[in-house]
Amino acid sequence: MGSPCALGLFCCCSSCFCLCCPRHRPASRLAAVVGGAAAVPAVVSGVTGLILSPSPSPIFIQPTPSPPMSFHNPGLELALDSRPAPLXPLGVTSPSAPPLPPVVDLPQLGLRR
């Protein structure tokens, strides 16, 4: 029927697009399997996760749910922090920032037009 697939599926090149099949690998990034090896060719919309299929019944891919935020990762705290960053008033520099050099006027450098 089909050659064994590395994903544990069977690839029938006449009826499905398989990631493991060298003929179909550039054409499709998704192993569309509906009812075993009898799958329909599908076009995947990466934005919505919806498969546009020529079959009369629509096929939907549900995005994988994100893991619960109960784990503590210090690297993700900054990205997931919902509090706005404190803003300093204009004209006040941070103590850790070096002072800006004074503005140099062009005539002081001897450059003339």
UniProtKB/Swiss-Prot annotation:
**Could you tell me which residues belong to the region Homodimerization, and interaction with host AMBP/bikunin?**
71-113
A Pfam family recorded for this sequence: HEV_ORF1
Region: Interaction with the capsid protein; residue ranges are 47-71
The protein's topology relative to the membrane is: Lipid-anchor
User: Does the keyword Transmembrane belong to this entry?
Assistant: no
Family membership noted in the UniProt record: Belongs to the hepevirus ORF3 protein family.
Q: What does this protein do?
A: Small multifunctional phosphoprotein involved in virion morphogenesis, egress and counteracting host innate immunity. Plays critical roles in the final steps of viral release by interacting with host TSG101, a member of the vacuolar protein-sorting pathway and using other cellular host proteins involved in vesicle formation pathway. Also acts as a viroporin and forms ion conductive pores allowing viral particle release. Impairs the generation of type I interferon by down-regulating host TLR3 and TLR7 as well as their downstream signaling pathways.
Instruction: Quote the record's miscellaneous comment.
Output: The viral particles present in feces and bile are non-enveloped, while those in circulating blood and culture supernatants are covered with a cellular membrane (quasi-enveloped).
Q: What is this protein called?
A: Protein ORF3
- Name the lineage: Viruses, Riboviria, Orthornavirae, Kitrinoviricota, Alsuviricetes
